[in-house]
Amino acid sequence: MEQAPEDQGPQREPYNDWTLELLEELKNEAVRHFPRIWLHSLGQHIYETYGDTWTGVEALIRILQQLLFIHFRIGCRHSRIGIIQQRRTRNGASKS
């Protein structure tokens, strides 16, 4: 008969602690890339929609992750990650 493998991995933090730590890291990163008024408005929207609940925390984490992913994917001035098109001269040579 099959049995589930024993948990041999490292001990994990409690979910609530890990979630709050992740939210704090995302907020710190978001402040570096977006206007504070946008982030404040997002926080107000989440609070009005979900109140002070874990569902609201999870929604805020998900939205911040999506915003940062798209921001980096499009091209952030602070990052080398992204798809910013470089101008090219004839013969495909780039300006230096």
Swiss-Prot record:
Region (Homooligomerization): 1-42
Modified residues annotated as Phosphoserine in this record: S79, S94, S96
Top-level taxon in the UniProt lineage: Viruses
Localization: Virion; Host nucleus; Host extracellular space
Keyword field: Activator, AIDS, Apoptosis, Cell cycle, Host G2/M cell cycle arrest by virus, Host nucleus, Host-virus interaction, Ion channel, Ion transport, Modulation of host cell cycle by virus, Phosphoprotein, Transcription, Transcription regulation, Transport, Viral penetration into host nucleus, Virion, Virus entry into host cell
This protein's record includes keyword Protein transport: no
Biological processes, Gene Ontology terms: DNA-templated transcription; monoatomic ion transmembrane transport; protein homooligomerization; regulation of DNA-templated transcription; symbiont entry into host cell; symbiont-mediated activation of host apoptosis; symbiont-mediated arrest of host cell cycle during G2/M transition; viral penetration into host nucleus
Record GO cellular component, one term: host cell
Keyword Ion transport (UniProt): yes
PTM characteristics: Phosphorylated on several residues by host. These phosphorylations regulate VPR activity for the nuclear import of the HIV-1 pre-integration complex.
Location (main, coarse): virion
Quaternary structure annotation from Swiss-Prot or TrEMBL: Homooligomer, may form homodimer. Interacts with p6-gag region of the Pr55 Gag precursor protein through a (Leu-X-X)4 motif near the C-terminus of the P6gag protein. Interacts with host UNG. May interact with host RAD23A/HHR23A. Interacts with host VPRBP/DCAF1, leading to hijack the CUL4A-RBX1-DDB1-DCAF1/VPRBP complex, mediating ubiquitination of host proteins such as TERT and ZGPAT and arrest of the cell cycle in G2 phase.
Biological role: During virus replication, may deplete host UNG protein, and incude G2-M cell cycle arrest. Acts by targeting specific host proteins for degradation by the 26S proteasome, through association with the cellular CUL4A-DDB1 E3 ligase complex by direct interaction with host VPRPB/DCAF-1. Cell cycle arrest reportedly occurs within hours of infection and is not blocked by antiviral agents, suggesting that it is initiated by the VPR carried into the virion. Additionally, VPR induces apoptosis in a cell cycle dependent manner suggesting that these two effects are mechanistically linked.
Family annotation (HAMAP family): HIV_VPR (MF_04080)
Extra remark beyond the main annotation: HIV-1 lineages are divided in three main groups, M (for Major), O (for Outlier), and N (for New, or Non-M, Non-O). The vast majority of strains found worldwide belong to the group M. Group O seems to be endemic to and largely confined to Cameroon and neighboring countries in West Central Africa, where these viruses represent a small minority of HIV-1 strains. The group N is represented by a limited number of isolates from Cameroonian persons. The group M is further subdivided in 9 clades or subtypes (A to D, F to H, J and K).
UniProt record similarity statement: Belongs to the HIV-1 VPR protein family.
Protein name: Protein Vpr
